Amino acid sequence: MTKRTLGYSYPIALTISLVPALTPAIVQAAPLTPPPATGILDGLCYDYVPKIEKLAPGKDANAQPVEVDADRLEAKQGGTAVYQGDVKVRQGVRKFDSDYAELDQKSRDVIAIGNIYYNDGQITVTSDKTLKSNLDTKNSELEEGKYQVHGSPVRGSADRVTMTNNNQNITLEGAQYTTCPPGQEVWTLKAGSIDIDQTEVFGEAWNASLWLYDYPVFYFPYINFPIKDERKTGLLYPGYTQSSKNGMDITQPFYWNIAPNYDATITSRFMDRRGLMEQVQFRYMPDPAHVGSLYFENLANDKQYDETPSLNQAMSDGHRYLLNANHTSLFADNAMRVSLDYTKVRDRDYNYFNDFSPKVGTQVENQLQQSLMAGYFQPNWNINTEVRTYQILLASAQQPHELMPRIDHNYYQQGSWYDLAWNTEITKFGYNNAQAIAQNQGGAYTGTRVYTAPTLTMPLINEAGYYLDSQYKLMYTRYDQEVPDNMSQTFVSRFTPENGNGVTLDEGIITRTLPSFRLKGGMTFERNQNWFGGDANQTLEPEFQYLYVPYKNQDNIGVYDSTSMRQDYYSLFSDRRYAGLDRISDSNRVSIGLTSRVYDEAGDERIRLAVAQAFDFVAPRVKLYPSETLTTNTRSPLSFEGDAKINEQWFAHAGAQYDVDQSRLSSANSALEYRREKLISQLNHRFVRDANYDLENKGQVTDLNQIGLLLTTPLNDQWHLYGGYYQELNQSVKSDRKVGLKYDSCCWSINFNLEWVNTPDNVTMRPTSERSLGIQFEMKGLGSVGTGSKGTSLDTEALPYIRPFNLRDQ
């Protein structure tokens, strides 16, 4: 055995050139990262994958000394060095082995033969044939090579690998690529030739085919693929879905890399039941502080127009389109912000989102928001302005008032014994009369509102375990109001009191000044308990609030942005009965609440129970609309909330608001959830009185009374079952049903899912059913084809999965 330490790196350089050349070509679908986490499959799939090895930070791999071992070293005449028998070359973490290696000192040609092995800590290459290389030109050629990427299941082979131009150009002939474990090659990508130019973004493959087991299933005469995390103009992979509403739905996107900070995606979407839709998205970022996008969809003629009453009754033809603009800008070291969120569909196209499900736009209660905002923010003050309009997506909905604009100023100051806040707002409320007329609605009152409210908060007691705060507020509001003669009958009826004495709205200047006094306090008691088989800490937290606001009749003021607040535990300790500023309710009320929590010995909250109720000394007299019946109730609904972490698997939640005067539930919600590793199941229920559209009687409302069941569970190491079921109990309507089955192996998966969704038509308000079937086949590390989602999410098309448990650290 001969061992030498050399001052040059000739022998190791034979294969050093392989790494930068070969890696991008075969790793483009799976970067050099740890194997993908698949949970229970990890130990079964990836035990053969070698770990990534690196030198210590700061060390240069090329500067490390080279050690060569061989059974025999022979120096031939003419300057040729021959290494024979168990040749081993080491340089840092790099390793190179062969049976025979020959170096011509003059031509700088190198030949290695037999049992070739190369490992640089990131990739391993082996061959039983020949490696030829030149140390000056860096051109190399390897016959019948196999490769395995470290930290990744990516592996494969090539009949011949040729590297030229200082390793910038690589050609692989007879190449194969897979992420399947050895002996389990479910899929393999084979190509007659692959060319890589490392100065380019994409590699190119000719005569490529995808094989499943021993059978070719797809053939690509030519295909390109990314070798860098950069963008390039060209066709993207097509998409395909199938649904009962649109039928076969095929998308073919084309990507246009205009510049490093500008690009566009142009997509042709063919729906065999509707026609051809064009989609264009343009994205821009002139610098990191300014970013935005423009998006447009256009369907020239919807083939469903003549057959769909909700379309041909609302629009004159089948032309359908959507426009979306989104922009954000930051100025003055991010102190100033400007944002635009604008989405529009064709007028009276109420079902556009139901039919095409675009992934853009902000929808709030069947209204498309169109907003331009600007703000300037400092530590103790800020000023914001917003212009906001809406487009209605529900034929029977009343057109809302628009902000034209709103200017809002907030000031905060914290002293040693007080907190001062001052909110000032100026809003001009407009109304889209043209759209209202298009919806067969009349005009509406408009106005300008000025509101200012200084608020002084003084802590009276602030000790460990108890506190008492007092708050003083003075609210001044001024309206300049206009009331048209052709006002919508909806508004006329709302502002006509029960006695029928005529519309109460006043025109001109209206002022309102109201003081507010608030006293709020609470205490916390603790005791140690022996619960859950260990030490626990239980708290008892009583709290109270007294709120006084004098009465002032406000029936002459229009309702622009106000609505009744949702009733729950927390609303009982608010200083408002109405959201918005158009109605400030009188109040002479005491709210009392009691919360108890249990913490285990680790400090995790395991149980939270809370109950509260408010008592009015005088029933409030302010109403949202004069037509409403004045309530004489002096007690709020009794509010209850409870959460429990029963153990590491079981969680429970319940909440209810009980109307003690009418002896009935106002609302309730509950959930019971079981979680263990990848198994999640949840049974939930929600009830809200008079909060749902009556699908049998148009224009009427009924109770929302819905039960849901969700499940996702592994059946074994490979099979996974998931689904969701939502049922409207009062209307016997199955809101959403979804069931799926997924098979997941080391290198491929297949997912079947079937879903039925019932949503009301936004014109007829009749339920419409949508059925979709998804089949998703994924080759890990290569891509996926098919329809539907490849995940096992608990989300359904109609409702998202929510964990309603209000426990700390959960």
Curated annotation (Swiss-Prot):
Broad class of the protein's primary localization: membrane
Location in or out of the cell: Cell outer membrane
Gene Ontology CC annotation, any one: transporter complex
UniProt keyword list: Cell outer membrane, Membrane, Signal
Leader sequence residues: 1-29
Biological process, per Gene Ontology: Gram-negative-bacterium-type cell outer membrane assembly; lipopolysaccharide transport
HAMAP family in UniProt: LPS_assembly_LptD
Similarity comment text for this entry: Belongs to the LptD family.
Subunit-structure text: Component of the lipopolysaccharide transport and assembly complex. Interacts with LptE and LptA.
Free-text function comment from the UniProt entry: Together with LptE, is involved in the assembly of lipopolysaccharide (LPS) at the surface of the outer membrane.
Protein name per Swiss-Prot or TrEMBL: LPS-assembly protein LptD
Gene: lptD
